[in-house]
Amino acid sequence: MKLNKLAIATLVSAALSQYAFAQTDTKGTIYLTFDDGPINASIDVINVLNQEEVKATFYFNAWHLDGIGDENEDRALEALKLALDSGHIVANHSYDHMVHNCVEEFGPNSAAECNATGDHQINSYQDPAYDASMFAENLSVLEKYLPNITSYPNYKANEFARLPYTNGWRVTKDFKADGLCATSDDLKPWEPGYSCDTANPSNSVKAAIAVQNILANNGYQTHGWDVDWAPENWGIAMPANSLTEAEPFLGYVDSALNTCAPTTINPINSKAQEFPCGTPLHADKVIVLTHEFLFEDGKRGMGATQNLPKLAKFIQLAKQAGYVFDTMDNYTPNWQVGNNYSAGDYVLHLGTVYQAVTSHTAQQDWAPSPTSSLWTNADPATNWTQNVSYKQGDVVTYQGLRYLVNVPHVSQADWTPNSQNTLFTAL
């Protein structure tokens, strides 16, 4: 009997050791993100993901539910439900993909009219307040078609967003970036004669930056991408939708891991030029951008026939290579009781990002909060708020006015910008 117990203990110990090795041997985390659904093609994409036991993040535009997105979208509601019921993350990509700025008068045929011109990335953003309101409109329409949508824990469209066209980031106070050549005021970014001055970006880009700041002040995190899985043969005859093969695309992911990929990605309109290279939250992570319409047989090519098998194969190869997959709500790790935190670590708690002030082991009554001495608020918002570690040179907004931070400090309730001339200068 003693021998049996010893044998069992040995086996258990070996199994645990192998498990621990497997846990520490992870190569990196891949975040599969899909833009511009829900459309009919979303269903097949989700089925492949489910078959491969991988969760993804879908940045949805609700105009497809209204049937005005100029896609194969009569099953859009079915796709939305399937994504939610399967546990995938549903995030916000605006109601109409900013097409209201592409045509003179937005209406049911606007998507087709914009597609006919191809001018999506000219004057894409014009009025920051109105453009930002399209994210709130997206929520309203999603909830109209699925009234119980907010009961899904994986419905995150009121917390996580991605701007159309632009590789933009608002993750923490010090983890921000914008696509400074993403859109233009005159020429498409790939047309002859186009030039981009990152020191003085287009009015459209400036408006997009303002939209990102509005979203951040409304509690959103926005994420761009490290790698774009797109056709390498746009513009040729069928099957023009053919994506990069799974093996070389995994090589692209390998090349992006632990590099400053958003600054080197091509083409120029896909870059995030001022991405904070080396930021710790970016370590060991690769965000893959792709689009559901690339996975259907239709007007653009043979996407389902060509690309659905590539998606499955890529997932299989990535797992074999040591990658794991996760969703964007876990990009910034959630605060957990019992975790050991080092000074400088970031967590997400109740919709707010915090940074650890001192090293400690989290306890139930030590949760991050506006009054915590263990954590400071590290949200990407520009609005002044309490318990933020402000640096000299930071610019904040308070009661509609902008202020420059003169002295580094952690904000307190009675140190508002309008009452502390030594800490702030009005702009």
Swiss-Prot record:
Top-level taxonomic group: Bacteria
Pfam families: CBM_5_12, Polysacc_deac_1
Keywords: Carbohydrate metabolism, Chitin degradation, Hydrolase, Polysaccharide degradation, Repeat, Signal
PROSITE patterns assigned to the protein according to its UniProt record, in alphabetical order: NODB
Chloroplast keyword on record: no
InterPro entries hit by this protein: CBM5/12, CBM_sf_5/12, Glyco_hydro/deAcase_b/a-brl, NODB_dom, Polysacc_deacetylase_ArnD
Domain NodB homology: residue ranges: 28-326
Assigned EC number: 3.5.1.105
Gene3D superfamilies named in the record: 2.10.10.90, Glycoside hydrolase/deacetylase
GO molecular function annotation: carbohydrate binding; chitin deacetylase activity; chitin disaccharide deacetylase activity; hydrolase activity, hydrolyzing O-glycosyl compounds
Entry keyword Membrane: no
Physiological role: Specifically catalyzes the degradation of N,N'-diacetylchitobiose. Key enzyme in the chitin catabolic cascade.
Protein name in UniProt: Chitin disaccharide deacetylase
